[in-house]
Amino acid sequence: MGILNVTPDSFSDSGRYTAPDIAVAQAEKLFADGADIVDIGGESTRPGYVPVTLDEEWDRLRPVLTACARKGIGPISVDTQKAEIARRALDEGTSVINDVSGLADPQMAKVLQASLCGYVLMYHPQGAVGETVSIEGMYRWLKTRLSQLSQAGVEVERVLIDPGLGFAYGVEANWAVIAELPALLGLGAGLLVGPSRKRFLAMVSTQPASERDAATAAISALLATQGVDVVRVHHVAMVKEAVAVADRLVEAAHRG
């Protein structure tokens, strides 16, 4: 999954893709580099972000989604916490809704039920962020949300769960979560992880956020060996190659 932020305050893109024509060209490049889907966001979710209005978020997304649909660029995912934005995006041909809030909008499940789209459910309990997290607690929280979705008519086969790296716990805890990710496979949903350029990688990289792609590729390759289905990244070409190496290693191990 390639990342395309059309926000002026992205933590690593610095507003490079706010102009619709530049954003569409970047979407084309991400697919050319090997992305299976491109995730477009109109509201920054970096630490300390300032929420934007529904209209402002849609004004950023609409021209890009319309142009992508017109040019046959896809499949497209939209990164939003708002059910109304999700509904409008689906009307524009979006295939997946990526919700970092973990169903905080009470109308989101209804919007999903009315479509056949995919949905990314992130572990993101509301309230104060703690430094640590238990994989057992994460499992229970996600299981509850999956049950809510099922009761609303959204099948688990349409859902990817995301452990929320960089969102719901301290920097050091990201490493522990990654080490224990296989425990989440028992939930029956696919698994998506977004490690790209995040702050926990600064513990092993001296590069600024915009240049943490080598570290991102390394952790993405490791994730591929743990049963992760999708990695959400900025530098698709580099990560695609790293994951291909990991996949070959896993295949060789299974043959042996």
Regions found by a protein language model. Give the residues of each.
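N-terminal glycine-rich anion-binding loops that anchor highly charged ligand groups
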Residues: 1-2, 29-41
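Short beta-strands and strand-loop turn motifs
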Residues: 7, 38-42, 121-123, 160-165, ...
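Active-site-adjacent loop and "lid" segments of alpha/beta metabolic enzymes
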Residues: 11-29, 45-69, 73, 83-84, ...
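Short acidic capping loops at alpha-helix termini that bridge into adjacent secondary structure
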Residues: 155-159
